[in-house]
Every structure is written in C-alpha cells, then in structure tokens.
Amino acid sequence: MKKVPLNCEVCGNRNYNVPKKEGSATRLTLKKYCPKCNSHTVHKESK
C-alpha cells in the first residue's frame, strides 16, 4: 500500500494522507473535514 495526499477542492489545502492500493487506476475522492474551511468538503487525490 502506498500513502497518497488528499487536497481540499475548495481551498486546495493538503490535509490528509491515506493508504491506497498501488494497482488502482482511478483517483480517490472522499468527503472529509477541512480545518481551514471549517466544514466537510470533497477531498481529491493529488500526485
């Protein structure tokens, strides 16, 4: 497993590092809490 960073879609802040299987072709999207936005927002995997 490889850890990938997640960026907030609203502010672009890099908040989380989550494990992901290396063979997966799709990008990860999760709804997580962003402390900078002070709300739950969509976070997408970044390179």
Swiss-Prot record:
Per its UniProt record, what InterPro entries does this chain match? Ribosomal_bL33, Ribosomal_bL33_CS, Ribosomal_bL33_sf, Ribosomal_zn-bd
Record's keyword terms, sorted = Ribonucleoprotein, Ribosomal protein
Question: In the record, what terms sit under GO molecular function?
Answer: structural constituent of ribosome
- Output the GO biological process annotations, alphabetical, semicolon-separated: translation
Protein name listed in UniProt: Large ribosomal subunit protein bL33
Q: Which NCBIfam families match?
A: PRK00504.1, rpmG_bact
Cross-referenced Pfam families: Ribosomal_L33
Q: Which cysteines are joined by disulfide bonds?
A: none
Asked if the Swiss-Prot or TrEMBL record annotates the protein with the keyword DNA-binding, the reply is: no
Question: Might you report a single GO cellular component term?
Answer: cytoplasm
- List the gene name: rpmG
Family named by the database record: Belongs to the bacterial ribosomal protein bL33 family.
